Amino acid sequence: MTSYSISVSVKGTNINKYPGKQHARRVAARLAKQKGLIYLPGQQTVLSEDSDQARPFKQRRYFFYVTGVVEPDCHVTYDIAEDKLTLYVPDFDFKRTIWTGPTLGKDDAKQRYDVDAVEYYSSLEGDVQRWAQGNPSTPIYILHPDQKPVTPLTVAYLYESKSLQHAMDACRVIKDEHESEAQIAGLFIDVCLSLRSRGTAYQTIAASGPNGATLHYTRNNEPLAGRQMVVLDAGAEWDCYASDVTRSFPIPSSVSGKENSGKGDWPSREAEEVYAIVQRMQEESISRVREGAMFFSIHQHAHSIALDELLRLGILRIPHGSSKADLVKAEATALFFPHGLGHHLGLEVHDVAPDSGTVPVTSSSSSSSSRVTAVTAQCQDGLMSVTEHRPPCTLSAPPLAAGMVITVEPGIYFNRLAIDQARAERDKPGSKGRFVDFDVVERYMAVGGVRIEDDVLVTKDGSRNLTDAPKGQDMLDMIYDRC
C-alpha cells in the first residue's frame, strides 16, 4: 500500500502546530483593544433527533481559527492584556471513555496545540467569573449574544458582540504561510483520503450532459450513456480547511470511433469550442490576479472574453439597429455565464469576506478607490456588465491582498430553462433574448456546461495556483492514457 505524509514547518518555536496563538494575537490587534477577554465555544456534541447517535462533527470555524482544535466539546478564551490563550477540554468521563473512547485530555492538548494553558471545562465558569470581577469595566468579546459562557451571572457582565466577528473575518481572509502550505496544497482526493481528511468540503457535483448546466447539481444519479461531458466539482476538507476544484471533461465512451492520438479527443466540435472559451477565460483571469487588483474588474474581463467568443461562434448576435454596447447593457453574456468568477476560500468553501476598508492598505492597493471609480465609470458607459455577485465580485469589495485565497471558476452553460425563458422574452426591449441566435444555441445544448475552477493564492507580485489537477491537454492525455 502506498503511504503519504505531509510535514509542515512553521517559523517560530511551535513546529508543526497550527498557529492558533498567532491568530489570536492578530484578532486582538484588529480589535485595537489593550484589554478584554475573547471567548469562543467549539462545536458541541449534538445527538440526532430521537436518537442516541451523535450527528457528524464539524468544528466551528471561528473557534478553529484561534486553536486548531478538531475535537468536540471544547472552549477557548484569550486574555488580551495577559496575552494568554486558554483551551478548555471536556472533563474526564469514565463511562464515556468506555463507550466512545477517550476525549481530548489536558496533557495531550498542551502537546498538540499552540495554547498557553489547558483546563477542564468545569473550570470555565469560575475562571470567567474571576476575570470579570477583576476587570469590571472591560468587555468579554463574543461572536453572538447567544454564545455567552455558561454562568449564572451572565447578565452582570459586560458582553460585546458587535466587533469580534468583523475582526476575525478581516484576519481570516488573509492566509498565512501555515495555512497556504499545509491546509490547501495537496488537498485533493487521493492524498487527502489516504491520510485523515474527514471528507468533502461540500456536496460533490458530478453532472453529466444537460445536468452540467445546473450550477449546484447534487443528485448525481443519472447514467452517462449518450452524454458528451461531465462537470466534476469536488473538494476535500483537511483540518477544517476547504478546497474547491472543478474540472469538465469528455466522457471517453462518447468519443466513439476515434483514434486517440492527440486529435479527435472531443465528443463534438461544440464541446471542444466551449471548453476552449472557458479555458481562455480562466487563464487570462488568473494572469490578472495580484495584490491590489480589483476582482470585480477581473470578473468583468472574463465576461468580455465570453462576449467576443460567443459572438464569434454565432451564439450571440447584434441585431440590426443595435450595438455591442446594447448587448453589454442587456447583460446577454449572463445567460451563459450567470455566476461570479470566484469567491474567498478558507475555513468555509465560501469563506468570509472582509468589509470594505478592513484590509490593510498597501502600496499596490492604495489606489483602490480610484480603481473602483474607473470600474464604475466603465459600467455606466455601457462597457461592462454591472451585475454583482458574492464577494469579492462586487464593486465595494476591497482590492485583493497578499495571503488571500480565492477561486477562479469561469463557466459557460446551456441551461434549457434559462434558454427557453430568454426565447420567450426576446421581443421585449433590452431583453437578453434579442441578442441570441437560438438556432445556433440548439447545436450546443448537448454540451450542457463547462466550468474550470482553481484555488489561487494572491501574492505580492502576482499569484500562485494551488491546484495541480490536470486540465486542457494534460487532462486529455490522462483520460486517454497518453501520460
Swiss-Prot record:
Keyword Membrane annotated: no
SMART domains: AMP_N (SM01011)
Swiss-Prot/TrEMBL GO biological process terms: proteolysis
UniProt-listed InterPro entries: Aminopep_P_N (IPR007865), Creatin/AminoP/Spt16_N (IPR029149), Creatinase/aminopeptidase-like (IPR036005), Pept_M24 (IPR000994), Peptidase_M24B_aminopep-P_CS (IPR001131), X-Pro_dipept-like (IPR052433)
Binding of Mn(2+) 2, residues: D233, D244, E453
Ranges in a coiled coil: none
Pfam families linked: AMP_N, Peptidase_M24
Transmembrane parts of this sequence: none
EC number in record: 3.4.11.9
Keywords in alphabetical order: Aminopeptidase, Hydrolase, Manganese, Metal-binding, Metalloprotease, Protease
Annotated Mn(2+) 1 binding sites: D244, E409, E453
Enzyme type, top EC level: hydrolase
Cofactor: Mn(2+)
Catalysis: reaction(s): Release of any N-terminal amino acid, including proline, that is linked to proline, even from a dipeptide or tripeptide
Gene Ontology molecular functions: manganese ion binding; metalloaminopeptidase activity
Disulfide topology: none
Binding note for cofactor: Binds 2 manganese ions per subunit.
Biological function: Catalyzes the removal of a penultimate prolyl residue from the N-termini of peptides.
Family: Belongs to the peptidase M24B family.
Protein name: Probable Xaa-Pro aminopeptidase MCYG_06503
